UniProtKB/Swiss-Prot annotation:
One of its GO terms (biological process) is removal of superoxide radicals. Its EC number is 1.7.-.-, 1.11.1.-. It comes from Inia geoffrensis. This is Myoglobin. Keywords: Cytoplasm, Heme, Iron, Metal-binding, Muscle protein, Oxidoreductase, Oxygen transport, Phosphoprotein, Transport. Residues 2-148 form the Globin domain. It holds the Pfam family Globin.
Length: 154
């Protein structure tokens, strides 16, 4: 399940491009998530009123939250699987406060892959996509284990 050094390098190479515009990438990821899986929008009280893509694109709050999401994910990815300290508070808040099901983390992972491929097609080929998928799967597996420890079966 772990990633090789080469796979981590592919993940971190593309992540460097994401960090050049975290808010923009994050906004695109959330829009893709909400459009593809409208039920996920119900978990976000401050975004429920956003019904169209144009409204989502115009929302500074959505952009800020996208930045927050991808900043946290970047911190986790940079740990190359040694992310226990970063994962614990994230799992705690997502399990007990926000009640985000693991399925929704799968949905946002799909959105991340889609956005990276659409924004960086020349830098996010099959090998990089496979490596990122593997890294996101590792993240989901580890957060699911934390959820279980917390008694959340989402």
């Amino acid at each position: 399940m772990g990633l090789s050094d080469g796979e981590w390098q592919l993940v971190l190479n593309i992540w460097g491009k994401v960090e050049a515009d975290l808010a923009g990438h994050g906004q695109d990821v959330l829009i893709r998530l909400f459009k593809g899986h409208p039920e996920t929008l119900e978990k976000f009280d401050k975004f429920k009123h956003l019904k169209t893509e144009a409204e989502m694109k115009a929302s500074e709050d959505l952009k800020k939250h996208g930045n927050t999401v991808l900043t946290a994910l970047g911190g986790i990815l940079k740990k190359k699987g040694h992310h226990e300290a970063e994962l614990k508070p994230l799992a705690q808040s997502h399990a007990t406060k926000h009640k985000i099901p693991i399925k929704y983390l799968e949905f946002i992972s799909e959105a991340i892959i889609h956005v990276l491929h659409s924004r960086h097609p020349g830098d996010f080929g099959a090998d990089a996509q496979a490596a990122m998928n593997k890294a996101l799967e590792l993240f989901r597996k580890d957060i699911a284990a934390k959820y279980k420890e917390l008694g959340f079966h989402g």
